Amino acid sequence: MRNLAVHFASYDVKARIFVLQIGIADDHEFPTYQKDDGFYQELCDRVKEYFDETGEDPKDWRYGVMRMIPVFALYAISYCLVQGLIPASWPVRVAAAVVFGVCQVLPLLHVMHDASHTAIGHSESGYKFWGQLTLDWMAGASMLSWHHQHTIGHHVYTNVYGADPDLPAGGEPRRFVERQKWASIYQWQWLYMPVLYGLLAIKVRFDDVLFVWLQGMDGPIRVNYYDSPLFRVFAVKGGWITYRILLPLMMWGVPFKTWLALFIISELMSGYWLAWNFEVSHISEHTFFPTMHKAAKDGELPISWAKAQVLTGVEYGHQNKLTTFMCGALNYQIVHHLFPSISQYHYPALAPIVMEVCEKHNVPFRVEPSFAAAFKAHLKHLYNMGRKGQAASL
């Protein structure tokens, strides 16, 4: 049994949902948090006041869609250049492959991410459309997998080892938390992991078939299917394979070596763009990794959910609008985790409010000056976790 009651407020800032207790669970599949001590309630009240005063729609879909129109256009143009449909020199095609890799990711960081949190408009069909268009059809991945890994898993159990699907399990080449058993290879992870991050885009397309569809698991999270596995595997994957692999090779006559080189460039670019943005926000020398105590029945984690969201995140580059656009507002990670159902385009306005309440309640709120500073803190954490002789914390 998973306790998700704490998240009603984060998806209903204006408190339209009334939670009715119908019983008390004897045990839980995953750890539970301490009850809110008034910190999150005050945050919600202040954010509600902001929207009441400004009259802004917390889920206004226009912000994201308008920003993505030029990105979609650039996506199509760079695709045509890469495949030779628009004649161009080799350097131009290589540059187009880089641009295509970024444009494959930007819609995911903007409209897909908001759609997965019901933060783009007020229509369920709209959430499905934007999510499946950008993640399933354009990127060849799985919205079902993302819902379980990210929305149900990571956002609920952020940085909780054994519960957060974003943290490594045993036998992986990365050591992020002290509870993982140390191995000699980890002393070099601060060098090789930033390179391996480029494989993320390719990896997730295999993972959502091998684990989500075949094993019914997304990391430690059990999968509840809400549509046809056969449709997702054969239609979506087939569509992506057709336009990314079969058409260039079989219809447009792109030489295999040329296609392979450009394909690898674009996919590595997508992987790096995703992974580097994801990792710096939570895997850092400045973030908190809650430790759960398996024997406890209630309040296994020594902190409330809202305070955990602040302590497990790092923000950066608040003053840089380009950074905010290029990372899909992931540089406002703490604000996003506290209010995932609010459109990311409101985060710059909400951040000062959140920081003020955090200061009042003595909850540390970490902001780095730039992405470079956040990335340096990530590398420092990789280095520290790889040091020889660090015992696993049980």
Q: PLM features: what roles do these ranges have?
A:
Residues 1-42, 72, 76:
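Histidine-anchored, small-residue-rich loop motif
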Residues 2, 181-182, 250, 259-263, ...:
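Active-site rim elements
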Residues 27-49, 199-216:
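Short, charged cytosolic
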Residues 44-66:
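Membrane-interface, cytosolic juxtamembrane amphipathic helix immediately N-terminal to a transmembrane helix
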Residues 59-108, 135-139, 187-202, 225-277:
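Alpha-helical bilayer-embedded segments of polytopic membrane proteins, i.e.
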Residues 99-226, 289, 293-389:
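Membrane-embedded catalytic scaffold of the fatty acid hydroxylase/desaturase
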Residues 265-279, 283-284, 354-364:
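C-terminal, active-site-flanking charged/polar segments
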Residues 391-394:
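C-terminal regulatory/interaction regions
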